[in-house]
């Protein structure tokens, strides 16, 4: 998240200050040279105390901005775990417990992120509350099927259009959803000054991997479909798929 003043072009901005939140051991030297950027390492794929701390520092950073400041924000896959601010009545231990349960029981990324939205004060469009209708340009690196903005990092800056019924979950998850008071997505006017653009997709990464693999001399097969599910099932699928490619 970067703050810049109203009198600067977005393509020639004078960065006032910013905050960078990424995975443990993933901060590059190119970022660390900027003294006006606060750099934070957090946890992925399961949230920890670092995720809660990152959420608090992000909110404090946004709320410290002046009313006429503008924001440039990059959101990528992994943000759901890296940054969190929990709804009242939800503890970090519970968040970790339920996240591990969802990850280990074959739930899709959409189903996992839908649950995360329900127990969060910033996911599912709710980070827009803290931006308080300031002008914002949000750029996305997508890691989800169909590149749905409401799914990438659990959609902190877009109105939630990916509502999944509680019936999609097992009793262990549904019991928790019944007990907590879930946060509500803000009204439409909170999103009017937020401009969203996808700048990179899974397809870009796949094509780059394909190109590099071919350049290294490997026999390469490009898989068109997005694959997700239980690793036990998928390992069998890929074994059969690769076997068929050789015939």
Label each residue range with its predicted role.
Residues 1-247:
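N-terminal loops that bind phosphate or other acidic moieties
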